Swiss-Prot record:
Family label: Belongs to the cytochrome P450 family.
Pfam families: p450 (PF00067)
Job of this protein: Cytochrome P450 monooxygenase; part of the gene cluster that mediates the biosynthesis of the sesterterpene variecolin. The first step in the pathway is performed by the variecoladiene synthase vrcA that possesses both prenyl transferase and terpene cyclase activity, converting isopentenyl diphosphate and dimethylallyl diphosphate into geranylfarnesyl pyrophosphate (GFPP) and then converting GFPP into the tetracyclic variecoladiene.
Binding site for heme: 470
Protein's name according to its UniProt entry: Cytochrome P450 monooxygenase vrcB
Top-rank taxon: Eukaryota
Organism: Aspergillus aculeatus (strain ATCC 16872 / CBS 172.66 / WB 5094)
The entry's keywords: Heme, Iron, Membrane, Metal-binding, Monooxygenase, Oxidoreductase, Transmembrane, Transmembrane helix
Pathway assigned to this chain's UniProt record: Secondary metabolite biosynthesis; terpenoid biosynthesis
Biotech applications: Variecolin and its derivatives produced by employing P450 monooxygenases from other fungal terpenoid pathways exhibit anticancer activity, thus, the skeleton of variecolin could be considered a privileged scaffold for developing anticancer agents.
Transmembrane segments: 5-27
Enzymatic reactions: variecoladiene + 4 reduced [NADPH--hemoprotein reductase] + 4 O2 = variecolin + 4 oxidized [NADPH--hemoprotein reductase] + 6 H2O + 4 H(+)
Length: 528
């Protein structure tokens, strides 16, 4: 018996040594710069992401300082830090095929060697691709499938589509304003992350399914929604490293999952909420005689359910994944951008005064007379505040890897083999001191025409670029311009910071979206 165990462990040890040798000396990426330990095993990334808690992005920055602009960050992935190369990695759909990459890092077994373990990795990859989120458009790996899925959502999230639902946004903002006014001089402390989670969550659910949880009316605003999304966000690295855990959570009763893993329970709760939304939308479709097709008059999922998509694409489970991603993405990163802006505007009387002065004329007739989103965009100081809020909150903080499946990429003297995941991060581009002097400072003035650096727009990528850029960009921008215009206009509810510092908003940990240091309390205000 012991002999069998001994042979097994000897075989595993021999395989591990052979795999490390292959990765370091025979792998197609073996000549690329980077630390040997990162090239040898995914456990190095696991340590920085899971054990240290979303800190690999800072280790990657250190690698760039030591090894240069192109580095190998794990056995199979390249990261580049060169703003001029961004549009080569993130290309339009008519330039070349571009596929998304989701790693199964951390086990140390995901090699490309021809072996049983290589087959095991392939099986796990296939399982991952059919897992809870990968069925969603934004997580679709294949180029053509992503294009086919996205075209059904584009009309709702295009600039035209968003302008057609300005009324929905403005009605929600009026509710938000009324709720804040209702707390005037009450002495109550309000956490703005909960407020904005309610606001953004209500809007995206209403657009997607015509119904919303109406969180803006809840006594605690969107606290439960925010905590659920944030708790799941804190588990994202574990799920990326071990994607089969997501499938397992669906097989375990929610109460038991909650006891052992609040993060997994949060995912299960979000998934169930999305699943129920799609189920209800299908019931409504069955009762409907005619479905309106116009983006401004129908919900996203009514439109999709009545489209010419194949039946498999309209299955409840797959659309629930779409809903899950739209609901989560429509809240998490945008809340961080709002937090960044609220803190800096409320903590700087001069900035607040300048913004109010700029809004005085255009918002004079509000709410009877409402300017358009396009008119608000033309206000230079408001424009600068929105730009800085998104720059310093990063959008998606981590590198977003893309794969060129058909042709190699050339970066300077380096030829990157076709099929290699290549990523770049908004964190690097937004923190570039050559483009953004004093990059850590919140300076709306830097976006003014007389101070505008020619490369600032090149480096500003909170929504990414190319065929897979964030589909919700226009909705997010419209929400930001309108919320800031209404809440900082003359006569708006007067918000005052309560025990909030810059550390409460500065992203230091990468959980796809950046989050502040653990233990910070967010932006807390009182209405005076």
């Amino acid at each position: 018996m012991y002999g069998i165990y001994g042979l097994f462990f000897a075989a595993v040890a021999l395989y591990s040594v052979a795999l490390v040798i292959y990765r370091l000396y025979l792998h197609p990426l073996s000549r690329f710069p980077g630390p040997k330990i990162a090239a040898a095993t995914g456990w190095y990334e696991f340590y920085h992401e899971v054990i240290r808690g979303g800190m690999y992005i800072h280790e990657i920055q250190r690698m760039h300082r030591e090894y240069g602009p192109i580095i190998r960050i794990n056995p199979y992935e390249i990261v580049i830090n060169d703003p001029d190369y961004y549009t080569t990695v993130y290309v339009a759909s008519n330039t070349r095929r571009s596929e998304k990459w989701y790693t199964l890092q951390g086990t140390g077994l995901e090699g490309k060697a021809l072996s049983f373990f290589s087959h095991f990795r392939t099986c796990r990859t296939r399982m991952h691709m059919t897992d809870q989120i990968v069925g969603a458009m934004g997580m679709t790996m294949g180029h053509e499938l992503h294009r086919r899925r996205r075209k059904h959502f584009d009309p709702f999230f295009s600039r035209l589509g968003v302008t057609q639902i300005e009324g929905v946004i403005l009605d929600e903002i009026q509710l938000l304003t009324d709720r804040l006014e209702g707390n005037r001089k009450s002495g109550r402390t309000i956490q703005m992350e909960h407020v904005m989670a309610a606001f953004t969550g209500d809007i995206v659910t209403k657009i997607c399914s015509e119904k919303s949880p109406d969180m803006i009316r809840h006594p605690d605003f969107g606290k439960e929604w925010y905590v659920t999304i944030h708790t799941y966000q804190l588990q994202v690295h574990l799920f990326v490293q071990f994607p089969y855990l997501i499938s397992l959570t669906q097989l375990i009763p929610r109460g038991l999952v909650m006891h052992f893993s609040p993060g997994a329970a949060a995912f299960k709760s979000l998934h169930q909420y999305a699943f129920d939304h799609i189920t209800e939308a299908k019931k409504d479709m069955g009762r409907a005689v005619k479905v309106q097709q116009e983006a401004g008059r129908s919900s996203v999922f009514r439109h999709v359910l009545s489209s010419d998509m194949p039946g498999t694409e309209r299955e409840t489970e797959r659309l629930a994944r779409e809903a899950l991603q739209l609901f989560g993405a429509g809240t998490a990163t945008l809340v961080r951008a709002f937090s960044m802006i609220f803190y800096h505007v409320l903590s700087d009387p001069q900035m607040r005064g300048q913004l109010r002065e700029e809004l005085k004329d255009i918002m004079a007739g509000y709410p009877a007379k409402r300017p358009t989103w396009q008119e608000l965009e033309r206000l230079p100081y408001l424009h600068g505040i929105v730009k800085e809020g998104l720059r310093l909150s990063y959008g998606v903080m981590r590198h977003l890897a893309r794969v060129s499946p058909d042709q190699p990429l050339q970066f300077r003297e380096w030829t990157i083999p076709a099929g290699t995941p290549v990523g770049m991060s908004s964190h690097s581009l937004h923190s570039d001191p050559e483009t953004f002097p004093e990059p850590a400072r919140f300076l709306p003035e830097r976006w003014m025409k007389d101070r505008h650096h020619p490369n600032m727009n090149r480096n500003w990528v909170p929504f990414a670029r190319g065929s897979r850029m964030c589909i919700g960009m226009n909705l997010a921008l419209a929400e930001m311009y309108w919320v800031l215009a209404v809440l900082f206009r003359p006569g708006a509810p007067q918000l005052e910071l309560f025990e909030t510092t810059e550390a409460d908003v500065v992203p230091v940990r990468d959980y796809v979206g950046g989050i502040p240091e653990f233990g910070t309390k967010g932006v807390r205000v009182r209405v005076v």
